[in-house]
């Protein structure tokens, strides 16, 4: 029997984490218990090991099985990969055995090229649909260039910012179909300028390059840092999940969100999460736009929200633990894209463990085993001196994304956070939004403050996992990253200015408040 490198979501279950990775095993498990999951397949962790053994190449056998997976997906979904009439577009996502937030890479909208884009638009005369297609295309070119070809995101962000400035608009959603079409052309030109070759138009070649990129990212510097800190063996490898795209950016009847079945900061038993209308999942997690609280989804999409509440209950009853979920609504229909046991602060871990015993989900012994002893010291998080806090006036407020109190000197890059901390300075890292590359600087800082992003953004999730104080989504900050300064409530802060942030309330103060 030849090796089986590929499993469809109907062939796996949650006991197969070692082979399918956490994400793949949970997608298969959600399929098995009847939840709405777009039907795709997983390339195993063993294929990742084989990729490294073959000198960082995907062998023909693995690729052939992946294409069989594509053919199965085409049958399940009634669309064809690379077809001009009814194209199947896919996402390619990593999924290791242990959850590694933001460490590994995702590519969305794969399968688009100039011909597919033109055919999709010709088949649907609605001008809003045209905008959606060009939006998906420019996102794909940007992600593929960044993740697969390692052309920095910043080149594309600069083109977007320039386009918005030229058009006099503030948000990406305000760009028109014509603007996005022009952006896609600019992105392809930038790709050629950086790499000297044309952007690949063959969907099969795109897929192969994307799978290789996920395997390669298992060995990238930030993944290695996270593995070292969390005792994850190098030999485990990562799986690759390929699934049909569902589009949260299709129209205003669509959206995307991230939610926790309980509050990951306090442990309170209430749904906590965030939602963006007319957006793709990356927008919520990457903190590109600051989203709205999940409860507002009830007004926008009552049927999908009611179904989502049922899904949350089903998942908690099934996994007997707090779940962290990603979902998309396409034309009012709910799709589940991921679930996993959610990362939580130490106080939340204690409360959730006790509550799960009271609710009959866990025995006391199981509840004790859920608590990571390394996290208990963060119960002694620094708190501001109560009298000093009372006397201080907050300059501004963001979201209290990870509890604790932090004060120190302002720095604007992860590298500066590291070098200042090595000199013994206490620093607060201030960013527009953090990305996985910032992990070493986030570790070095006393606290993290971001202008964009919500409670489920990269900064918030990683900070909670590390027990570091974080305030996210303070949109009142006027940021000038290039000149290393920001303005808040009329005060300008430069590199080395002193600042205090409260990760419980989200308040931001000038100067140092004693802890």
Sequence positions of predicted segments:
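Short, hinge-like loop/turn segments at secondary-structure boundaries
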Residues: 56-58, 487-490
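Acidic, glycine-rich catalytic loops of TOPRIM or P-loop NTPase phosphate-binding modules used
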Residues: 467-479
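Nucleotide/phosphate-binding sheet-loop regions of phosphoryl- and nucleotidyl-transfer enzymes
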Residues: 1-392, 419, 425-428, 435-440, ...
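Generic beta-sheet signal
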Residues: 451, 471-473, 501-502
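Surface-exposed strand-loop junctions at beta-sheet edges and helix termini
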Residues: 429, 449-450, 488
């Amino acid at each position: 029997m030849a090796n089986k490198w590929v499993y469809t979501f109907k062939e796996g279950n949650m006991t197969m984490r070692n082979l399918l990775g956490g994400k793949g095993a949970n997608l298969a498990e959600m399929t098995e218990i009847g939840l709405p999951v777009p039907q795709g397949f997983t390339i195993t962790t063993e294929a990742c090991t084989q990729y490294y053994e073959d000198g960082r190449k995907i062998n023909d056998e693995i690729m052939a099985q992946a294409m069989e997976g594509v053919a199965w997906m085409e049958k399940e979904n009634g669309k064809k990969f690379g077809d001009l009439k009814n194209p199947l577009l896919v996402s390619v996502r990593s999924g290791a055995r242990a959850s590694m937030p933001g460490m590994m890479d995702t590519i969305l909208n794969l399968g688009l090229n100039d011909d597919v884009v033109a055919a999709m638009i010709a088949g649907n005369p609605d001008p809003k649909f045209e905008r959606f297609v060009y939006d998906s295309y420019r996102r794909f070119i940007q992600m593929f260039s960044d993740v697969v070809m390692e052309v920095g995101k910043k080149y594309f962000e600069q083109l977007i910012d320039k386009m918005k400035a030229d058009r006099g608009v503030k948000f990406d959603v305000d760009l028109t179909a014509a603007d996005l079409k022009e952006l896609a052309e600019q992105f392809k030109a930038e790709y050629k300028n950086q790499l000297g070759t044309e952007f690949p138009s063959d969907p099969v070649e795109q897929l192969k390059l994307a799978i290789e990129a996920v395997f390669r990212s298992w060995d990238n510097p930030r993944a290695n840092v996270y593995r070292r800190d969390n005792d994850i063996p190098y030999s485990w490898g990562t799986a690759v999940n390929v699934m049909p795209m569902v589009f949260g950016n299709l129209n205003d009847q669509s959206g995307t969100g991230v939610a926790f079945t309980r509050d990951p900061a306090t442990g309170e038993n209430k749904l906590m999460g965030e939602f963006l209308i007319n957006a793709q999942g990356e927008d919520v997690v990457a903190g590109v736009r600051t989203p709205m609280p999940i409860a507002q989804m009830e007004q926008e999409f009552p049927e999908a929200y009611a179904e989502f509440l049922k899904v949350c209950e089903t998942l908690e009853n099934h996994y007997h633990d707090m779940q962290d979920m990603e979902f998309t609504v396409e034309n009012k229909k709910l799709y589940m894209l991921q679930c996993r046991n959610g990362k939580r602060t130490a106080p939340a871990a204690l409360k959730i463990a006790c509550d799960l015993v009271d609710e009959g989900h866990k025995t006391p012994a199981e509840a004790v085993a859920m608590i990571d002893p390394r996290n208990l010291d963060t119960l002694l998080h620094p708190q501001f001196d109560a009298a000093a806090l009372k006397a201080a006036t907050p300059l501004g407020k963001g979201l209290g994304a990870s509890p604790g109190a932090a004060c120190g000197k302002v720095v604007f890059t992860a590298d500066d956070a590291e070098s200042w901390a090595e000199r013994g300075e206490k620093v607060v890292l201030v960013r527009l939004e953090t990305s996985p590359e910032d992990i070493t600087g986030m570790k070095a800082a006393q606290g993290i403050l971001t202008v964009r992003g919500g409670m489920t953004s990269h900064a918030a999730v990683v900070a909670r996992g590390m027990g570091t104080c974080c305030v996210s989504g303070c949109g009142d900050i006027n940021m000038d990253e290039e000149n290393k300064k920001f303005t808040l409530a009329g005060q300008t802060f430069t590199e080395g200015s002193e600042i205090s942030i409260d990760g419980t309330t989200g308040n931001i103060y000038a100067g140092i408040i004693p802890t």
